[in-house]
Amino acid sequence: STSLEVRKLVYLVVLRYAKSHPDLALLSINSFQRDLADPNPLIRGMALRTLSGIHLREVSELVMMAVNKASRDPHPYVRRIAAYALPTCYNLDHGNYERLVECLKTFFCDRSPSVLGAATSIFQNLCPDRWDLLHRHFRKLCYALGDMSEWAQPTCMLVLTRYSRANISKPSSTHVDPDLQVLLTSLSAQTASMNPAVVVSVVRAFSALFPERLSAVFPALIRLLRSPPDVSYVVVLHAIELLRSSFVDISPYLTAFYVRASDPAYLALAKLYVLVHSASASQASDLAHELATYTRSSCITVALRSVTALGQLASRHEGVALQSLQLLVNVTQVPTLSTPVLSRAVHVVQSLLHTCSPSTAAVVVVRFALRLFVPLANRVRDPDAPRIRILTDTVSRVAVLWMLGLHLKTCLAGSSLLELIVPDLLRCLVAHWSKEQASVQCQALTLSAKAFVPVSYTHL
């Protein structure tokens, strides 16, 4: 047929059914061989792609001959397809390896960036350690990097990075190898690419070659955080990797990692890790308020992780420990807060009490203790004030009793907590004993023992 569209359809049908109907596919070989000499480069390229995509060992030699011929084709489109056909030739017959390497040398001598991009991709798959093939062409590949296909660029960057690490001396603050400088300059020019894979590859290359200059390309990675969630997640994972390597300071870009309401859970959790571990002391206060907002997320996983992150932030920056403690106490008073998040918040408060003064700890403990039973809560609530949420879950009740036992002797308003609240609390516990879980009962007995010991020693 003279119709290009009909020919495309025929090529697709042959590729689709070649494995299930090999005899019929073999009958079409002569047609493909004639098309390899067609004046139209599109037809020549499609014929070569179809011939190499049949994957029949009977035609392995024909495919090899077609690739050899196409490697000298006047049109770069055909030469690029010939380059991508090399792995197929190797899979059909491993004995063609040396011949394929010779073909690859021909492609590296090409002047077309599209062919060079295909050649580097095939090099990575076919002979990734044959550095002798690249020695003469290293700078040419660096200069052609910007003109390659955006999907060939990441592979080419990987190949050039591996070559540099294996064959070029490591840079220092005073000396950078000229070849490496050429590569770094070419890489820097790709940070404006609209393809996220290219930008990520640039950052990875700098991290491997010259991490001291990462700060120059890191803003391009931050720009990708405005991309769809799957791309943003990859960006955050790379930011975490760089954060652990300590080669770049992420704190100036902290707000870019703030969690959005539309972020899926997996992305929000990764962002929370970056926020907690990259915040500076001057940013900790604002971040604490931001994390407190996340605790009200509709996603339980994000809310739980936000509560934990608030505690981690307080542990990393002592200056915001008291603020974080107060924010967590406020979080526990939210009426709509889910029980798992409430339990986690009480547990984190329990772990942070040692960071504040005894008087502050006493106030926090009393506020939680009054929320164990309705009579105690009503005793301090104004008639017009909203109802106080009672801590009904087992984990929270055990944590409050533990905190109260730890601070029995702490004074508040001239009296110890043992005198202020413990007797009334124990009476309520006894009245509701049969309704309490075993862990709460055990902690209540421990509290009673701690309360009895100082009293008994006083009367001795």
Language-model features: where?
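Core helices of alpha-solenoid repeat scaffolds
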Residues: 25-29, 59-64, 94-101, 130-139, ...
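Buried hydrophobic core positions in alpha-solenoid tandem helical repeats
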Residues: 31-33, 66-68, 103-105, 140-142, ...
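Conserved small/polar residues in nucleotide/adenosyl-binding loops
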Residues: 458-459
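Short inter-helical turns and helix N-cap capping residues of alpha-solenoid HEAT/ARM repeat scaffolds
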Residues: 2-3, 39-40, 74-76, 111-112, ...
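Residue-level signature of the C-terminal ends
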Residues: 17-21, 54-57, 89-93, 126-130, ...
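Residue-level signature of alpha-solenoid helical repeat scaffolds
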Residues: 11-16, 45-53, 83-88, 117-124, ...
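Solenoidal tandem-repeat scaffolds enriched in leucines and small polar residues
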Residues: 70-198
